[in-house]
Amino acid sequence: MTAPAGGTPRRYLVVAYQTLDSDELVQSIRDHAGDGPSEFWLVVPATPVGDLAVRTVPLPPMPVMGGPLAMIGTPEEARRLAQEKLDAAVHRLAGAGATADGEVGDANPAKAVAAALKRRPADEIIVSTLPARMSRWLRQDLPRRLEHEFGLPVTHVEVPKFTLRDA
Protein backbone atom coordinates (compact mmCIF):
# COMPACT_ATOMS: atom_id res chain seq x y z
CA MET A 1 0.00 0.00 0.00
CA THR A 2 1.15 3.52 -0.59
CA ALA A 3 0.81 6.72 1.38
CA PRO A 4 -2.49 8.57 1.08
CA ALA A 5 -2.80 11.32 -1.52
CA GLY A 6 -0.83 14.48 -0.85
CA GLY A 7 2.25 12.65 0.39
CA THR A 8 1.06 12.44 3.98
CA PRO A 9 2.40 9.43 5.83
CA ARG A 10 0.29 6.30 6.04
CA ARG A 11 -0.73 5.78 9.67
CA TYR A 12 -0.54 2.33 11.22
CA LEU A 13 -1.85 1.34 14.62
CA VAL A 14 0.06 -1.67 15.96
CA VAL A 15 -1.40 -3.67 18.86
CA ALA A 16 0.89 -6.18 20.54
CA TYR A 17 2.15 -7.23 23.94
CA GLN A 18 4.14 -10.43 24.34
CA THR A 19 5.21 -10.36 20.67
CA LEU A 20 6.03 -6.65 20.61
CA ASP A 21 9.78 -7.22 20.31
CA SER A 22 9.55 -10.17 17.91
CA ASP A 23 11.59 -10.22 14.73
CA GLU A 24 8.40 -11.06 12.79
CA LEU A 25 6.62 -7.88 13.91
CA VAL A 26 9.69 -5.72 13.30
CA GLN A 27 9.97 -7.18 9.79
CA SER A 28 6.28 -6.51 9.11
CA ILE A 29 6.74 -2.90 10.20
CA ARG A 30 9.82 -2.57 7.97
CA ASP A 31 7.82 -4.01 5.05
CA HIS A 32 4.99 -1.53 5.61
CA ALA A 33 7.47 1.35 5.99
CA GLY A 34 9.04 0.34 2.68
CA ASP A 35 5.76 1.13 0.93
CA GLY A 36 6.27 4.88 1.47
CA PRO A 37 6.10 7.50 4.20
CA SER A 38 4.56 5.95 7.29
CA GLU A 39 4.02 6.41 11.02
CA PHE A 40 3.46 3.64 13.55
CA TRP A 41 1.50 4.09 16.78
CA LEU A 42 2.07 1.17 19.13
CA VAL A 43 -0.71 0.21 21.53
CA VAL A 44 0.37 -2.07 24.35
CA PRO A 45 -2.52 -3.33 26.48
CA ALA A 46 -1.80 -3.34 30.22
CA THR A 47 -2.28 -7.10 30.39
CA PRO A 48 -2.56 -8.46 33.94
CA VAL A 49 0.49 -10.50 34.91
CA GLY A 50 -1.65 -13.59 35.51
CA ASP A 51 -2.90 -13.52 31.90
CA LEU A 52 0.54 -13.69 30.28
CA ALA A 53 1.57 -16.87 28.49
CA VAL A 54 4.97 -16.60 30.14
CA ARG A 55 5.23 -14.89 33.48
CA THR A 56 7.62 -11.94 33.29
CA VAL A 57 7.64 -10.84 36.91
CA PRO A 58 10.43 -12.16 39.12
CA LEU A 59 9.14 -13.78 42.28
CA PRO A 60 10.84 -14.02 45.64
CA PRO A 61 11.51 -17.57 46.82
CA MET A 62 8.47 -18.95 48.58
CA PRO A 63 7.07 -22.33 49.49
CA VAL A 64 4.14 -23.57 47.45
CA MET A 65 1.91 -26.01 49.26
CA GLY A 66 -1.21 -27.68 48.07
CA GLY A 67 -1.43 -26.44 44.51
CA PRO A 68 -0.15 -24.15 41.79
CA LEU A 69 1.27 -20.75 42.55
CA ALA A 70 -1.22 -17.99 41.77
CA MET A 71 0.22 -14.98 39.93
CA ILE A 72 -1.44 -11.83 41.11
CA GLY A 73 -0.21 -8.47 39.93
CA THR A 74 -1.57 -5.03 40.51
CA PRO A 75 -2.90 -2.87 37.68
CA GLU A 76 0.03 -0.54 38.35
CA GLU A 77 2.48 -3.41 37.84
CA ALA A 78 0.73 -4.37 34.59
CA ARG A 79 1.01 -0.77 33.32
CA ARG A 80 4.67 -0.56 34.36
CA LEU A 81 5.55 -3.77 32.52
CA ALA A 82 3.62 -2.64 29.42
CA GLN A 83 5.40 0.73 29.47
CA GLU A 84 8.80 -1.00 29.66
CA LYS A 85 7.91 -3.12 26.63
CA LEU A 86 6.64 -0.05 24.76
CA ASP A 87 9.78 1.99 25.48
CA ALA A 88 12.03 -0.86 24.31
CA ALA A 89 9.99 -1.38 21.13
CA VAL A 90 9.98 2.32 20.19
CA HIS A 91 13.76 2.38 20.66
CA ARG A 92 14.24 -0.77 18.55
CA LEU A 93 11.99 0.52 15.75
CA ALA A 94 13.77 3.88 15.71
CA GLY A 95 17.02 1.96 15.25
CA ALA A 96 15.39 0.16 12.33
CA GLY A 97 14.48 3.49 10.73
CA ALA A 98 10.74 3.50 11.50
CA THR A 99 8.85 6.50 12.87
CA ALA A 100 7.13 5.07 15.93
CA ASP A 101 5.67 6.06 19.28
CA GLY A 102 2.83 4.70 21.32
CA GLU A 103 0.82 4.28 24.47
CA VAL A 104 -0.14 1.79 27.13
CA GLY A 105 -3.83 1.00 26.83
CA ASP A 106 -6.64 -0.84 28.53
CA ALA A 107 -6.00 -4.50 29.39
CA ASN A 108 -8.71 -5.43 26.86
CA PRO A 109 -6.99 -5.06 23.46
CA ALA A 110 -10.21 -4.10 21.61
CA LYS A 111 -10.88 -1.32 24.14
CA ALA A 112 -7.25 -0.21 23.93
CA VAL A 113 -7.49 0.05 20.14
CA ALA A 114 -10.83 1.91 20.29
CA ALA A 115 -9.43 4.48 22.72
CA ALA A 116 -6.30 4.99 20.62
CA LEU A 117 -8.28 5.42 17.39
CA LYS A 118 -10.42 8.13 19.00
CA ARG A 119 -7.27 10.18 19.54
CA ARG A 120 -5.17 9.09 16.56
CA PRO A 121 -6.86 8.02 13.33
CA ALA A 122 -5.17 5.19 11.44
CA ASP A 123 -5.24 3.83 7.91
CA GLU A 124 -4.52 0.24 8.93
CA ILE A 125 -4.24 -1.91 12.05
CA ILE A 126 -1.47 -4.44 12.61
CA VAL A 127 -2.19 -7.12 15.24
CA SER A 128 0.70 -9.25 16.47
CA THR A 129 -0.11 -12.44 18.38
CA LEU A 130 1.35 -15.53 19.91
CA PRO A 131 0.95 -18.80 17.99
CA ALA A 132 -2.68 -19.90 17.63
CA ARG A 133 -2.29 -22.64 20.25
CA MET A 134 -1.31 -20.03 22.87
CA SER A 135 -3.11 -16.85 21.85
CA ARG A 136 -6.08 -15.55 23.83
CA TRP A 137 -6.40 -12.80 21.22
CA LEU A 138 -6.90 -15.35 18.44
CA ARG A 139 -9.37 -17.34 20.53
CA GLN A 140 -11.27 -14.03 20.86
CA ASP A 141 -11.00 -13.56 17.06
CA LEU A 142 -9.42 -10.15 17.66
CA PRO A 143 -8.09 -9.43 14.14
CA ARG A 144 -11.49 -10.04 12.50
CA ARG A 145 -13.36 -8.19 15.27
CA LEU A 146 -11.14 -5.11 14.85
CA GLU A 147 -11.58 -5.14 11.08
CA HIS A 148 -15.36 -5.41 11.45
CA GLU A 149 -15.68 -2.82 14.23
CA PHE A 150 -13.45 -0.12 12.75
CA GLY A 151 -13.74 -0.75 9.01
CA LEU A 152 -9.97 -0.68 8.57
CA PRO A 153 -7.74 -3.25 6.93
CA VAL A 154 -6.07 -5.49 9.52
CA THR A 155 -2.77 -7.25 9.04
CA HIS A 156 -2.24 -10.20 11.39
CA VAL A 157 1.33 -11.10 12.34
CA GLU A 158 1.53 -14.46 14.11
CA VAL A 159 4.83 -15.18 15.81
CA PRO A 160 5.23 -18.93 15.22
CA LYS A 161 8.09 -19.64 17.62
CA PHE A 162 7.41 -17.97 20.92
CA THR A 163 10.34 -18.15 23.33
CA LEU A 164 11.13 -16.68 26.73
CA ARG A 165 13.02 -13.84 25.02
CA ASP A 166 9.71 -12.77 23.47
CA ALA A 167 7.94 -12.57 26.82
Model-derived features: positions:
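A short acidic, glycine-rich active-site loop
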Residues: M65-Q83
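Structural beta-alpha unit
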Residues: M1-A5, A94-D123
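Well-ordered alpha-helical segments embedded in enzymatic catalytic cores
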Residues: E24, S28, K85-A88, A112-V113
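Small/aliphatic-rich secondary-structure junction motif
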Residues: A3-A70, H156-K161
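Structural motif
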Residues: R11, E124-I126
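Short, flexible loop segments at boundaries between secondary-structure elements
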Residues: G151-A167
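Short, surface-exposed alpha-helical segments at coil->helix boundaries
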Residues: R79-D87, Q140-P143
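Glycine-rich, Arg-bearing micro-motifs that act as flexible, cationic patches
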Residues: S128-R145
